[in-house]
Design a protein with these regions (language model features):
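Nuclease catalytic cores that cleave nucleic-acid phosphodiester bonds
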Residues: 49-50, 129-269
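Short, surface-exposed, polar/charged, turn-prone segments marking secondary-structure boundaries
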Residues: 56-60, 108-112, 179-181, 201-204, ...
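Non-catalytic nucleic-acid-binding/docking modules located in mid-to-C-terminal regions
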Residues: 2-5, 12-14, 19-25, 40, ...
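Residue-level signature of catalytic and energy-coupling elements of molecular machines
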Residues: 32, 82, 178, 240, ...
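Short alpha-helix boundary/capping motifs
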Residues: 101-102, 171-172, 190, 329-330
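A sequence-level detector of short, solvent-exposed, charge-rich linear segments
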Residues: 52, 56, 92, 102, ...
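Short linear functional motifs in flexible/disordered or boundary regions
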Residues: 92-94, 174, 256, 313
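Noncatalytic, basic helical substrate-engagement surface that gates or grips nucleic-acid strands
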Residues: 2-4, 8-13, 19, 23-167, ...
Length: 333
């Protein structure tokens, strides 16, 4: 029997290193766009769970998140860029269907909580209803262009492309909450890369240290994930990260574990391995941070989507740290 997981669950076997923002000064950070924008859509909401919207009824929570998160990271000395998902793997269809079912159930419970006047419950369920639409993705890219922040369009999984760019040395780390990044080969990833993050909030995960601590290879780490469950396959019921690790260390690989347990998986484990090791990466790209189009950004956020013009200008003023020759953004008006 199998069980679904939304992203691989490695919390019990991976020990992150605490770091602070000073450690990231001068570093280029690849941000997993889908992972981060989904956070914004889930968290940036009104008291009753309703997302931020403009006068047209269009969701703007992601615009707020991108504006303030990105400019804050730049103010702290980082050079962020975003990596967007391309076409999803066919192996992800079952997971996407399961997620849709969860969102629909949460939507019903959100409505019930609102009818009962239970604002706390309403907000809890509302945060689970977020959806990434084409409009949200295209709008996010448009805002980044106005801000002068580069983004990469991946062929496949954005986190895989971001991990590839870290491995190549074009970024210092991936900024994501998803442990899949180390499965894709990211040498470093940083969790909890938020505006309010302090010394104890940021977590650095180094692939080399993880493998050394667990005394396994990256291929074996992927095998553990296959047993536990990933975005691309159902895990084996009753196998968590610790048990999966012990089984792989005892038997050597996922094939021997499945043979010993006399269990068949719906997806060929070799297909899953190949997805993590032979992903369709974009190898030619340009990372160039440009001067922002202030008038365009202000018109887009304040004019079209009802943001406060003063707050937008104050946030955009932080972008001057990307170009030390500019003493003030007033020079770009």
């Amino acid at each position: 029997m199998c069980v679904f997981h939304m992203g691989v669950k490695f919390k019990d076997i991976v020990n992150p290193e605490p770091i602070n923002f000073k450690d990231l000064e001068g570093k280029t950070v690849a941000l997993d766009a889908a992972n981060i924008i989904y956070q914004f859509l889930s968290i940036i909401r009104q008291a009753d769970g309703t997302p931020l919207m403009d006068h047209q009824g269009k969701v703007t929570s992601h615009f707020s998140g991108i504006l303030y998160r990105t400019t804050s990271l730049i103010e702290k000395g980082m050079k962020p860029f975003y990596v967007f998902d391309g076409a999803p793997s066919v192996l992800k269809k079952s997971t996407q269907l399961k997620r849709s079912e969860i969102k629909e159930e949460s939507r019903k419970k959100w409505k019930e909580a609102m009818e009962n006047g239970d604002i706390q419950e309403a907000r809890k369920y509302a945060s689970r209803t977020s959806r990434m639409s084409t409009d949200i993705i295209q709008g996010s890219k448009q805002l980044l262009e106005f801000m002068g922040i580069p983004y990469i369009q991946a062929n496949g999984e954005g986190e895989a492309q971001a991990s590839y760019m870290v491995d190549k040395g074009d970024a210092w780390c991936v900024g994501s909450q998803d442990y899949d990044c180390i499965l894709f080969g990211a040498t470093r990833m940083v969790k909890n890369l938020t505006i309010t993050g302090g010394k104890t909030d940021l977590e650095l995960i180094r692939l080399e240290k993880v493998l050394s601590d667990l005394q396994i290879s990256r291929k074996q780490l992927v095998d553990v994930a296959i047993l536990v469950g990933t975005d691309f396959n159902e895990g084996i019921k009753g196998i968590g990260a610790k048990k999966g690790l012990n089984l792989i260390k005892q038997h050597g690989d996922v094939f021997k574990v499945l043979n010993e347990m006399d269990v068949e998986m719906e997806v060929d484990p070799q297909e899953l391995r190949d997805l993590f090791f032979e992903h369709n990466f974009v190898s030619e790209y340009e990372l160039k941070w440009r001067n922002p189009d202030l008038e365009g950004a202000i018109e887009f956020l304040a004019g079209e989507h009802d943001f406060s013009e003063d707050r937008v200008i104050n946030a955009l003023n932080k972008l001057k740290k990307l170009d030390t020759s500019q003493s003030s953004l007033e020079k770009w008006f």
